[in-house]
């Protein structure tokens, strides 16, 4: 199975453990990838994958699991003594971090109430394909970042990060379980699909104690 790093190292380990406990004779190869380098699942021996973002491969069945909210964050040290920015125009003037998988040189934010959208260019000081590296760089005060709310929640609770322009958010990212079309699906895949779908709201929902930030 192919899983994005952030989910594969954290939130999906518990259901994977339950799956293995329920099926004692089962073995799982757990591959962590944030890109989509594998195109032929059958040739690669891959049963299924968790994909974040829009599924564009017409050869894959895509089961929607959730949408992950994304917010704008930065370290207090980056902001100095001033008030955290409240509007997108203020964000454009700050140093930025980029998560190459989802944004590089441009950011678009949507107002949570009015639905109004604002788009502006950024010149990242730091660019990465790792959500963990992005969060760490943000905590160190390197720049402003856009990341999954569940991923940033612990650092927000500890005061290592603050949310900027809280009335504005980046578009949520869809999370899907995907697998190739086939005439027959093995029982191991059907059981895993059942488990993930039954726990999707818990797995991909908000972090406990995040207070909606």
Question: Which residues fall in each region the model found?
Answer:
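Short, well-ordered beta-strand segments
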Residues: 1-2, 49, 97, 145, ...
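Central regulatory/effector-binding core of bacterial HTH transcription factors
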Residues: 1-58, 209-213
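Solvent-exposed beta-strand sheet faces enriched in polar/charged residues
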Residues: 2, 29-33, 110, 164, ...
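Alpha-helix/helix-capping structural signal
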Residues: 5-6, 76-77, 132, 150-151
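C-terminal effector-binding regulatory domain of bacterial HTH transcription factors
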Residues: 21, 25, 149-154, 158, ...
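Acidic, Gly/Pro-rich loop/turn segments at junctions of secondary structure
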Residues: 31-127
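Hydrophobic hinge/microswitch elements
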Residues: 119-163, 170
